[in-house]
Amino acid sequence: MGAGAWGTALAKVLVDAGGPGTEVTLWARRPELAERINATRSNPDYLPGTSLPPGIHATADAGEALRDATTVLLGVPAQAMRANLERWAPLLRDGATLVSLAKGIELGTLMRMSQVIVSVTGVDPAQVAVISGPNLASEIAACQPAATVVACSDSGRAVALQRMLNSGYFRPYTNSDVVGTEIGGACKNVIALACGMAAGVGLGENTAAAIITRGLAEIMRLGIALGAKGATLAGLAGVGDLVATCSSPHSRNRSLGERLGRGATIGSVLAGSPDGGDGHVVEGVTSCQSVLALAASYDVEMPLTDAVHRVCHKGLSVDEAMALLLGRRTKPE
């Protein structure tokens, strides 16, 4: 449910993993995009250059997409999850496994995506799974080797999803720690913005390494306060996702941060302006607000997240944010 880059890439993975005869329905919000995907076997809007297998059928009709579906992958942006689910909930089959692909914390409620799914649909939390990891859609669509985490409190559902996704190039690992898997995914986008900002003002690898490492410390503090396992955040859904998103030129969050570091304004970048924006969703811009609020509610200190929030929403320059961080009181690691 969602024909963006990640939703489209995972639809391809499912068909490739399932082999001949496997069929996946891909819901697109815009009818013209669904028609284009079916006609051209490609998604030029979100995943240009990728040939899609014939087992993928796109539709803009949610009823058609969800009819008799026993596994539903929810690939809409985090802040749009609730509104979409409110429309889709009556169409869901009883007992279906609902899988969140979104990485973010809902503004206002400060809920993780699995909590939003349960809140809206009323399903048993054991029916809800999360897929998260170092998964840049363009690389996976190109069949480059990658790994991910399938987290669910129901081990049977986790293993079933693992089998559905296990292809020659995409390797899923199961995990019962839904909280840790979601926190790693939500927070890493914020740290990637910080890495991009540093690169944009011309800072080098030492700075990037410090941001990634201290960013991980923030993520660990928040995750553990929420009941996550440290091992989860040291794995693919934590360190793995953080490194990929902070380092890759394909990362929208890092790229946006880099443009901010070069002097673009947040408004112009998000609007898809000549400053370099592409108009696609960049979760970290919203996540820095909701993650910071969630951390405050648990009395967890997250200075990097706070600095990113100040740049994105309070008008602070990147240079001023760096000075603020470097001026903090020194302390043991």
Curated annotation (Swiss-Prot):
Positions annotated as active site in the UniProt record: 188
Keywords: Cytoplasm, Lipid biosynthesis, Lipid metabolism, NAD, NADP, Nucleotide-binding, Oxidoreductase, Phospholipid biosynthesis, Phospholipid metabolism
Entry-linked Pfam families: NAD_Gly3P_dh_C, NAD_Gly3P_dh_N
GO cellular component, one term: cytosol
InterPro entries documented for this protein: 6-PGluconate_DH-like_C_sf, 6PGD_dom2, G3P_DH_NAD-dep, G3P_DH_NAD-dep_C, G3P_DH_NAD-dep_N, NAD(P)-bd_dom_sf
Function: Catalyzes the reduction of the glycolytic intermediate dihydroxyacetone phosphate (DHAP) to sn-glycerol 3-phosphate (G3P), the key precursor for phospholipid synthesis.
Homology family: Belongs to the NAD-dependent glycerol-3-phosphate dehydrogenase family.
Protein name as it appears in the record: Glycerol-3-phosphate dehydrogenase [NAD(P)+] 1
Species, as recorded: Mycolicibacterium paratuberculosis (strain ATCC BAA-968 / K-10)
Lineage per the UniProt record: Bacteria, Bacillati, Actinomycetota, Actinomycetes, Mycobacteriales
